């Protein structure tokens, strides 16, 4: 548990948030394009 205590959680949350945006962005665009929606 010392390793977890030594880790700074803020950068981890930031990387996770950025990762979700990077993953969700193309998915949303693909769904809109698949449904024939215009951006």
From Swiss-Prot:
Role noted for this protein: A core subunit of photosystem II (PSII), probably helps stabilize the reaction center.
Source organism superkingdom: Bacteria
InterPro entries registered for this protein in UniProt: PSII_Ycf12_core-subunit
Keyword Transmembrane: yes
Pfam family name, one: PSII_Ycf12
Gene Ontology terms: cellular component: photosystem II; plasma membrane-derived thylakoid membrane
Naturally occurring in which organism (per UniProt): Crocosphaera subtropica (strain ATCC 51142 / BH68)
Topology relative to the membrane: Single-pass membrane protein
Spans through the membrane: 12-32
Compartments, record wording: Cellular thylakoid membrane
UniProt cross-references to HAMAP family, sorted A to Z: PSII_Psb30_Ycf12
This protein's UniProt keywords: Membrane, Photosynthesis, Photosystem II, Thylakoid, Transmembrane, Transmembrane helix
One GO term (biological process): photosynthesis
Chief subcellular location: membrane
Subunit field text: PSII is composed of 1 copy each of membrane proteins PsbA, PsbB, PsbC, PsbD, PsbE, PsbF, PsbH, PsbI, PsbJ, PsbK, PsbL, PsbM, PsbT, PsbX, PsbY, PsbZ, Psb30/Ycf12, peripheral proteins PsbO, CyanoQ (PsbQ), PsbU, PsbV and a large number of cofactors. It forms dimeric complexes.
Record-stated family: Belongs to the Psb30/Ycf12 family.
Protein name (record): Photosystem II reaction center protein Psb30
């Amino acid at each position: 548990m010392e390793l977890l205590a030594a880790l700074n959680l803020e950068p981890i949350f930031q990387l996770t948030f950025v990762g979700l945006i990077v993953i969700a962005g193309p998915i949303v665009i693909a769904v809109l394009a698949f449904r024939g929606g215009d951006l």
